[in-house]
């Protein structure tokens, strides 16, 4: 049983402090006005400490070269790794790998070849994702770096190319959710159980497109490996980052790391660790920092949790699923989520609890158990400790250090009708093989136990001991007033106006056209059948815009209108035409309750403006609640965006009509204005070369 309690807090401070996310962004923002403090909602230009790309490095390089760039801005900022398709030995893939390596060598970029490990793990081991820095990657699991106390967040390929060329890109600081851990985990319960439970309990998009900061006394008891797993799967939870604090546990991890990397490592050495210790003492969230919401979970009430099938939003205790006698065909211990040394050791303790290889618990008949280390370094250490040999003795099948089945590549994929259980991060239908297979996610110990039992079950069953008991998972949600916390009012005297660039309008005004639906996807905005037709004219793009959502959109919406829609607008694929087709229609601003992060990035990158105003969406829905249903509705309401004062006004009847809503919004700084003026990120990059 899950106990959910909900209460609300309203913040009315005229000025406020910064949370840890905002403080880190402040450090890595460029072009800020003197004295400017950044907050959630603000658009900022960022110069991240590092940017990682993996097998997609060659597409990024092609974008980079197509921009007209000749040399990278700062080779020390860039990291190239090969990890996704390393089992593919085709000429085409090997040529791509050679191209990436050649490009990296030419430009002096740090390069890690196939077999060295998964890019995110390399970023951790080699100190690129260092505590209190901002590190990005053109991969959705960049959130992983939050386990090291670094702010990690994903970017799209165009952003990566821009960073290569100019050293910077842009970011809109998301609302920040605070997640507090209380209590202490039972033995054998892991970080994977925590995040699987969180995804299943708080499964109503509570943290969608939020940055997360983990807090609470319980964190000191969580090993770094647990933190990395939790941060990694904040992606599946819907968040844009998952940041843990810097504490003694993390500092000691780095001190122990010195014994492996040696005293002369460029990023992990006595000097960097001492500087981190000093900085961490003072670099903390302010006491009056604002959070969009707060979630609390009592770890002492947690047992082993399993998500699925085919969804991270569905989770059950392993005891409940064990009673259902769910037979499995395949098990997996791979990926950037759970293939570190402690994960392999956890599985080895299930298959070989005594350490005697002659007394191992064999993988059940009819089950294939695939495993790989997150890096070659981990594989070597696992072999030195006998962990690797124990898994082999149990009948597990080794794979090279890479992504493999997690991304649906290489050996061991799920076949039609099969059931798999995996220590990876995604169990979407078809992700790990056939769309007609069922996939569950669990901790390494539960995966290993299930492989031995031949069905989903717990380590305690294999060991013949009493299982971890829980009287019910305790969790609560404390939600701030969204309007106040994400857009705190400021007095006229305390708020400096946004500096405006010549050529950018101080006011953006238009009539609101309502497409009243949540989760309007990219195929609804721009039909997939046109996506890979490179000769579609701008006029045709305008005609087909939103046709899969509503065939009447084209006749109802006019150039100069402002489109307003529901929550999670632009979900789905990464096609840039979802943004450019709206521009072709003459719509330069989209307002929604919330946006898909990828759509938001593609919008700014192509000079389409967006604003999140959930209050407006609710007001419109209330206004037309009893009106005849229309997929596209001309509302008769107008929106004016006062850009210098970062405010919006919604009026009725005309731009000068009765004010129905006045609200503060995020500031659009001059760096972002310049991107829009240049026609998008690519145009801006070209202007900088």
UniProtKB/Swiss-Prot annotation:
Its cofactor is [4Fe-4S] cluster. Belongs to the aconitase/IPM isomerase family. Binds 1 [4Fe-4S] cluster per subunit. Pathway: Amino-acid biosynthesis; L-lysine biosynthesis via AAA pathway; L-alpha-aminoadipate from 2-oxoglutarate: step 3/5. Disulfide bonds: none annotated. It catalyses: (2R,3S)-homoisocitrate = cis-homoaconitate + H2O. Keywords: Amino-acid biosynthesis, Iron, Iron-sulfur, Lyase, Lysine biosynthesis, Metal-binding, Mitochondrion, Transit peptide. This is Homoaconitase, mitochondrial. It comes from Candida glabrata (strain ATCC 2001 / BCRC 20586 / JCM 3761 / NBRC 0622 / NRRL Y-65 / CBS 138) (Yeast).
């Amino acid at each position: 049983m899950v106990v959910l309690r909900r209460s609300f807090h309203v913040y009315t401070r005229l000025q406020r402090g910064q949370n840890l996310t905002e403080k880190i962004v402040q450090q890595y923002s460029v072009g800020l006005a003197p004295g400017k403090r950044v907050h959630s909602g603000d658009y900022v230009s960022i110069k991240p400490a590092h940017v990682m790309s993996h097998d997609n490095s060659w597409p990024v390089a092609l974008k980079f070269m197509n921009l007209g760039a000749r040399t990278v801005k700062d080779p020390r900022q860039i990291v190239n790794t090969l990890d996704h398709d390393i089992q593919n030995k085709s000429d085409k893939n090997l040529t791509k790998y050679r191209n990436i390596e050649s490009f990296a060598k030419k430009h002096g970029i740090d390069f890690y070849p196939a077999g060295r490990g998964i890019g995110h793990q390399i970023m951790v081991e080699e100190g690129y994702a260092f505590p209190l820095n901002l590190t990005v990657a053109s991969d959705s699991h960049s959130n992983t770096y939050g386990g090291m106390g670094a702010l990690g967040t994903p970017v799209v390929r165009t952003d990566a190319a821009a960073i290569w060329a100019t050293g910077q890109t842009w970011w809109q600081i998301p609302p920040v959710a605070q997640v507090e851990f209380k209590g202490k985990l039972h033995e054998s319960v892991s970080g994977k159980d925590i995040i699987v439970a969180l995804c299943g309990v708080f499964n109503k998009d509570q943290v969608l497109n939020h940055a997360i900061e983990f807090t609470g006394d319980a964190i000191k008891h969580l090993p770094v490996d647990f933190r990395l797993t939790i941060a990694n799967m904040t992606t599946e939870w819907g968040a844009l980052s998952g940041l843990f604090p810097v504490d003694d546990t993390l500092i000691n991890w780095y001190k122990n790391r010195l014994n492996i990397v040696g005293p002369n490592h460029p990023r992990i050495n006595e000097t960097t660790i001492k500087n981190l210790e000093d900085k961490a003492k003072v670099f903390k969230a302010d006491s009056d920092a604002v959070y969009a919401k707060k979630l609390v979970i009592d770890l002492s009430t947690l047992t082993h949790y399993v998500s699925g099938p085919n969804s991270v939003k569905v989770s059950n205790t392993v005891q409940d699923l064990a009673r259902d006698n769910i037979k499995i065909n395949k098990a997996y211990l791979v990926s950037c989520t759970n293939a570190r040394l402690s994960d392999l050791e956890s599985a080895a303790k299930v298959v070989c609890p005594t350490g005697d290889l002659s007394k191992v618990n064999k993988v059940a008949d009819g089950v294939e158990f695939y495993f790989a280390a997150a890096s070659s370094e981990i594989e070597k250490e696992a072999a030195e400790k006998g962990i690797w040999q124990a898994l082999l003795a149990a009948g597990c099948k080794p794979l090279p250090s890479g992504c493999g089945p997690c991304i649906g590549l290489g050996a061991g994929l799920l076949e039609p009708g099969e059931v798999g259980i995996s220590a990876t991060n995604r169990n979407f239908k078809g992700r790990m093989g056939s769309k007609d297979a069922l996939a569950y996610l669990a901790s390494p110990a539960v995966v290993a136990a299930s492989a031995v039992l031949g069905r989903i079950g717990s380590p305690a069953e294999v060991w013949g001991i009493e299982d971890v008991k829980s009287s019910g998972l305790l969790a609560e949600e404390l939600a701030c007033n969204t309007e106040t916390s994400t857009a705190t009012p400021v007095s006229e005297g305390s708020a400096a106006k946004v500096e405006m660039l010549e050529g950018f309008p101080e006011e953006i005004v238009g009539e609101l056209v309502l497409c009243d639906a949540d989760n309007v996807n990219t195929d609804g905005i721009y039909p997939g059948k046109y996506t890979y037709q490179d000769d579609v004219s701008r006029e045709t793009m305008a005609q087909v815009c939103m046709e899969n959502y509503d065939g009447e959109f084209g006749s109802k919406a006019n150039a100069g209108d402002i489109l307003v829609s529901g929550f999670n607008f632009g979900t789905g694929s990464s096609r840039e035409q979802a943004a450019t087709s709206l521009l072709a229609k003459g719509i330069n601003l989209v307002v929604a309750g919330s946006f898909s992060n990828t759509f938001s990035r593609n919008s700014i990158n192509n000079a389409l403006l967006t604003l999140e105003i959930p209050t407006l969406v609710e007001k419109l829905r209330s206004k037309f609640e009893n009106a005849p249903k229309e997929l596209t509705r001309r509302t008769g309401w107008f929106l004016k965006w006062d850009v210098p004062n970062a405010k919006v006004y919604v009026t009725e009847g005309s731009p000068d009509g009765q004010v129905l809503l006045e609200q503060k919004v995020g500031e659009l700084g001059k760096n972002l204005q310049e991107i829009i003026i240049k026609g998008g990120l690519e145009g801006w990059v070209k202007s900088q070369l």
